[in-house]
Amino acid sequence: MQKQAVRLGVDIGGTFTDVVLERGDALFSTKVLTTYRAPEEAIVEGMARVCAQAQINPGEITQIIHGTTLATNALIERRGAKTALITTEGFRDVIEMRTESRFEQYDLNLTLPPPLLPRNFRYTITERMQADGQVLRPINRAEIEALVGEIKQAGFESIAVGFLHSYVNDAHERLVAEVVSEKMPGAMLSLSCEVSPQMREYERFNTTIANAYIKPLMKTYLGRLKGRLNSEGARCPIFLMHSGGGIISLENAAEFPVRLVESGPAGGAVFAAHIAARHQIDKVLSFDMGGTTAKICLIKDQTPKTARVFEVARSYRFKKGSGMPISIPVIDMVEIGAGGGSLAHVDSLRQIRVGPESAGSEP
């Protein structure tokens, strides 16, 4: 007799953690406060509640699907790991120079958002690949070893590697990875040829840096989550919602956590599209208000609008170009820092403002 499918859905937000159990046609749900220091504890508490409602034990769960804003919040709040960038000589400042676009064309005092890594965290090495993948300047292993030794001495936890045109020929990045694995076996490593193998170095470098920046945090969290769920008897496959609205394995998510940016909000947009399809509605505006943020997504023909580049932490009235570009498939939505728990304050001009600070789950 085939075992009945029992699925657990979990969404961790800035204020609440929502847990839903699906068994056949029956749904059981609960809401618990997010536990910031150990988010997995809120999941375990919520799982215990819905299992009690359904009168089953965690061992009967056959699949867990998890959405989270932890990756996004780590980037916005800049509380990731100490990360180094290794890039092609002459391209150290690509992420600081940005592109020629200006998000406020006539503002003579325009202040650009600072890059995720300061200049002294960005290292260069002699190498150059042509656009067709031919080696223009070969890379020297001894130079790599010396540079990795310097990075190790500086106490970096994570390393991002982004070379020019590595999406065509990744040989130089692979050699750096080989040396890092020998000299710094405990370091987290992100290669642009794996994280974002496409042209446009500004977006590619930013995406790779973001992945490296949050990788130690997310890999540690996902490892704790798996162990905690296993200890409670839930030893089923765990999947995570990615930014494009699909799911990826826990192992894949731990390796490429940048794909979890907008993981939680993407789930809300997908659900809204499902409701639109059920009722045959072609034009829908999805609105998802949480305790910390509110998200809006346009859904046309029962399909959420998607994009190939997403900006995290827009700093200038949410204008395009004022954030950090992440080059991943993503459900296109507008997110603002105003939710049910947003805090009111008086700014420097003595005007009343609401958000983006939130009371969260620990006001």
Q: Where on the chain are the PLM-derived regions?
A:
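N-terminally biased helix-coil "hinge/interface" segments that flank
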Residues: 1-363
